[in-house]
Amino acid sequence: MVARRLVKAVAVVLAMSFADTGAAAERISWAVQDFPPFQILDGPAKGTGSFDGLLDLLIARLPHYEHDVVPMTFARREAEIRQGTDLCTPGIFRTPAREPFMEFSAPALLHLDNRVVFRSDRSPRFADGGAVDLEKVLQSKDLVGGVATGRSYAPNIDALIIRYSGYSNLISRPWKSEQFFQMLLAGEVDYIILFPHEANFLAQRFSAQQQVGIRPIAGAPPSIATTVACTRTPLGARIIADINAVIGGALGQPEYRRLSERWYQDSDKDLIRRYYDQMMGVR
C-alpha cells in the first residue's frame, strides 16, 4: 500500500516537472514597417523612431513572452490581421473599421496632425500660407496626389481618401513614404500627405528642404494618438491587457514622454508637451 502511494506520488511529481519544463512561453509577433521617423529599420538612424522606442520598452517589460519582429508593409499588416493571424503592432490608429478585428491599447504615443506636402513651385495652389481644404484639393483634376495603400492618416482624412479613391488623380500604392517623396521631387505627383516631422526627415534625407512646402489641413485635430494593437483573439486580448499595464505605469515618466517628441523640431516639441497630458489622460 505504501509502495503504491509512493509510486503515485513520484508519478505526480514527474508529471508536474515535465509540464513545467515543457510549457512554452506565449509569442508576440510584432509587425513593423519601414516608416521613418516613426520606425527606422536601417541606416545610421536605425532604431531611433518613436515606435522603435516604444517597442524596445514593451519587449523589455514583457519578458514572459517570446518576441519576434517581422517587417511588412501597411497593406500586408492589415490583411494578415483581418485574416486572423496573431500579430501585434506598436503604432496604429484606432478606427471604427478596425475595431471588429483588432484589440487596441490605451493611447500610447502622441503625434501632431498630418500636413499636405507639395512642390514649392506649386505653392499658390495650396492655400498660400494658410490651411488647405483637402477635399477641394482632391477634387482638383489638375492636381495629382499620392497616398499609401493600407495606411491610416487620421479618421477625417481616411474618410476623404476613401471617398475619392476611384479618381484617376489620386494614386494609391503599397509604397513607403520615401517612394512617394521621390515621386513628388520628380514631379510625378503634386502633393502627398505626411506628418510634419516625417516630411522634415525626408526633406533632410534628400537635401530637398527648399524644394517642398508644407501646409496644415483645415479641420484636422491639432494632435492625435496612436495605440498598440493586436489581432482580436484570446491571445491578443491577453497581450493588450499586459501592454496597458506597462503604458499606464510609464505615461507620466519623462523618458516615456520623450518618445512622442522624437524627430520633431523644437517648436513642434513644445506643441506636443502642451497637448500631452490632456490627450494621453495623464493626471
For the regions a protein language model found, what residue spans apply to each?
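Extended ligand-binding regions for polar small-molecule ligands
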Residues: D52-L62, S120-A131, D142-L143, A225-R262, ...
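Short helices/loops that flank or line small-molecule/ion binding pockets
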Residues: G43, A60-R61, A75-L87, S177-E198, ...
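Periplasmic-binding protein-like
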Residues: Q33-P36, H111-R115, S207-N244, S267-V282
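Acidic, polar ligand-binding/catalytic clefts
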Residues: V69-Q139, G150-Y153, P216-G219
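Short loop->beta-strand "edge-of-pocket" segments that line small-molecule binding or catalytic clefts
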Residues: E26-L41, T48, G130-Y153
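Ligand-binding cleft/hinge of the Venus flytrap
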Residues: L55-P63, L138-L143, V147-P174, F181, ...
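A ligand-binding cleft/hinge motif common to bilobed small-molecule-binding domains
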Residues: R76, R82, G91-F101, D158, ...
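Extracytoplasmic small-molecule ligand-binding "clamshell" domains
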Residues: A24-F101, I243
